[in-house]
């Protein structure tokens, strides 16, 4: 049973947009079977599916079986330093999913 949502960032610079397909390629290049996250939230707020939610994620050792992994694009400022670059859409989606206890 999945009872936890884990939110990750893509650790990419502010303003650089990437897709779930891009992240899938990065993960495959690192030896994953496919993208490790269940959902990706792009800069414009578009939510793209990643790994099917019926499958365990590959995003947080020890928590993959019981969690949904969400990755938002960003996490670094334009100079490459860590920064909270979450968009309003990202905050709203993750907050609603957690509050409602819905299946994301």
Regions flagged by a language model, labelled:
Residues 8, 73, 104:
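Conserved residues at the C-terminal ends of beta-strands
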Residues 93-104:
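Single conserved hydrophobic/aromatic residue that forms the stacking wall/gate
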Residues 16-34, 66-95:
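Long, well-ordered alpha-helical scaffolding segments within enzyme catalytic domains
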Residues 1-55, 64:
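Short, conserved "active-site rim" segments that organize catalytic pockets and cofactor/ligand binding
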Residues 58:
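Glycine-rich phosphate/pyrophosphate-binding beta-alpha loops
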Residues 11, 43, 74, 98-99:
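Generic short alpha-helical hydrophobic face used as a protein-protein interaction/packing hotspot
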